[in-house]
C-alpha cells in the first residue's frame, strides 16, 4: 500500500514517525516520508524515500518570537504564537502536502500536521493514522496536557478540558484551515465525525508512565516509537561512540543534562552552573547541547563531556540521573533506563511529563523559566535520594518488560488498513 508519512516539528516529533515509516516499509508498504528539512539525515540513512519539507522548527525557535513561544504557559498566548508561526509556513506546507499525498492510499501523521492530514484524507477518501506522543483524546483520567497538568477532581472535568482546548485551538487556526479546505474542494467546516472514516489514533506512550487509560481498538496503546535494533544497526547507531564509551567507563555514572530544543539565553553561564552543581554533588556530567545549547563546542575532561547529541536509549543506562526538558521521547528513555529524572519544562506536553514523573515518584519537575543554579542543585540533590532512585528502578523494570512500541504500532496499522 502507498503510504505518506507527514513528520514535522522537532527531533522528538520526526524521529518516532521515522521509526514507524521504516517498520512499515519492512512490512512491504511503499512509504514516502515528508520530514522537516533539517531532520532528513536519519531517514536517508535508513534508505527511506524522504522528501524535505519547508518546516524548520529549529530556525523558528531561534527567533525572538520562537523563544517567546516556549515560555508561554497561558494557553491562548501559546496558541496565538503557534498560529503565527504556522501562518507563514502553513500555505507553503499546504502546497507541499497536496503534492506529496497525491496518489497515497493512506496518510500517517502526528499532532503537528494532523489538521492538514485529516483534510487530505477526507479529500482523497483514504484512511488516516494519527500518532499521539501524549494523551490528547478525551478521557476520564487525565486532562488535556495543554489545559491542565494535574488530574481534575472528576472524570467529567477531565473530559471537559479537551472540548475547551478544541474550541480555543479552532479559534486560532480556523482561517488557515478554511483556506486549505477550500483549496482541496472541501466545505470550510468538516462534517460530523460519524460521516467520516474513523482514523486510527496510535497512543504512543507507555502504560507504565500513564496508567489507568483504557481505549477502544481505534486507540491502541502501543508505547513510544523508537528505532528497532535492525534500524539502529542500519543507521550506525547500535553501539556507543567509542570515545564516549571510554569516557563513561573511566569513572562513576554521570548525570546526563540536555535541554533539547529549549532556548538557553546564556549557554556559558548555564554550563558553569551545571559544572558547579555536579562538582558539589560529586557527579560527573555529560551535556548534550541539542538546539538550546548549540553555541557550546564539544569538549572533554574527566568530569565533564560536552557533545551535540546522544542516543538516549544507548547512553542513559550508563547514567546515574537525567536532567532534561520533558519531551516524550527522553522521558520514556529515562524511565526505561531506571534512573531518576529532573524535568525543566517549557511548553507543549513538557509540563505534563514533568508532573507525571513527580506523581509516579520517579522525578522532580520545575519550570525552565524558574531554573537557577540553586534550583538545579536542589532538584539534582533530590535525585540522589533512595526513594526516587528505588521508584525509578521499579518503573524501569516495568517498562523494559513491555514490547517494543514500533513493531506493535506497525502491526496495528496493518490491521487497520486491512479492515
Give residue ranges: language-model regions.
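Nucleotide-activated sugar donor-binding and catalytic core shared by glycosyltransferases
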Residues: 1-11, 15-34, 38-49, 159-171, ...
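Conserved nucleotide-sugar donor-interacting segment of glycosyltransferase catalytic cores
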Residues: 88-159, 207-209
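Phosphate/nucleotide-donor binding subsite
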Residues: 49, 53-105
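Short gly/pro/ser/thr-enriched loop/turn and capping motifs at secondary-structure boundaries
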Residues: 40-41, 57-61, 130, 134-141, ...
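Short loop/helix-cap segments at secondary-structure boundaries that form the rim of catalytic
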Residues: 39-46, 118-123, 141, 209-218, ...
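Short glycine/proline- and acidic residue-enriched helix-loop micro-motifs
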Residues: 72-85, 156-168, 395
